[in-house]
A protein has these predicted regions:
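Charged linear interaction tracts used for macromolecular binding and regulation
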Residues: 65-232
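Long, polar/Ser/Thr-enriched low-complexity segments
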Residues: 1-105, 225, 229-235
Length: 235
């Protein structure tokens, strides 16, 4: 059941179907607060847009019957959006890109093994629904390059560590790292958790077309989702 009939709109909430009256357009001029809120939500929506397919699956555990993408937007708007002097930013320590009730790791960290490689480590204890076979999801975010975000499922909980080759376009400024786990048994996901960050000390202006070309090649070779390429092209 969906669609419109006159001034009625068919809706769905938590698998419950109902009708509501179509909202009237307000002719009042929005307040400064309303304008700021809309811009902030637009910022978060633009940030997450390339991750739509990923979030539909990995964030669906936030609320039963809800759309993972539609849940991730208000969550990160409320918990991770930062208002700055010239616009908005994201607190990647508070942001979440996966959400579910599968247990995460008690500890997680990241160090730079060499100029091209990250070493992500995590504790391997298991409890409740967790299992040694749970797959690891890593998420990298580079604010210096228009909030470029890359992600991939690689490794498992029992490994305790994973080396990740840094995408060429992401060795600028500060690189934030999160991890999450995905169950092979019941497809549940854990909340993504902050592992740390690496400061490369190079500004975004250091990026070149060469870096963009290398990034495209990296994505094609590694199988990383198109989110990485799309975000590079946003610049």
């Amino acid at each position: 059941l969906k669609g419109k009939m006159g001034n009625l709109v068919a809706c769905n909430w938590r698998d419950i179907y109902y009708l509501r009256v179509k909202a009237k357009r307000s002719k009042k001029k929005p307040t400064k607060t309303q304008v700021s809120n809309r811009r902030g939500f637009g910022f978060v929506s633009t940030l997450l847009a390339p991750l739509r397919q990923f979030l539909l699956i990995q964030f669906k555990g936030y609320e039963r019957g809800s759309d993972g993408m539609l849940s991730a937007q208000p969550y990160n708007y409320t918990n991770a959006l930062i208002k700055t002097a010239d616009g908005f930013d994201i607190d990647y320590r508070a942001a979440r890109f996966c959400y579910g009730d599968l247990p995460g790791a008690q500890k997680a960290s990241v160090v730079l093994k060499d100029e091209n490689t990250l070493l992500i480590t995590w504790s391997t204890e298991i409890k409740d629904l967790a299992d040694h076979s749970d797959l690891l999801i890593w998420i990298l975010a580079c604010p210096a390059w228009n909030h470029l975000i890359a992600h991939e499922i690689q490794g498992s909980r029992k490994d305790g560590q994973l080396e990740v080759t840094i995408p060429p376009a992401m060795n600028l400024g500060v690189l934030h790292v999160q991890i999450a786990f995905k169950s092979l048994v019941n497809e549940k996901t854990s909340k993504s958790q902050y592992a740390g960050c690496i400061d490369f000390g190079r500004p975004a202006e250091a990026a070149t077309t060469y870096a963009e070309d290398r990034t495209t090649a990296f994505c094609q070779a590694s199988g990383i989702s198109g989110a990485l390429i799309k975000r590079v092209n946003l610049r």
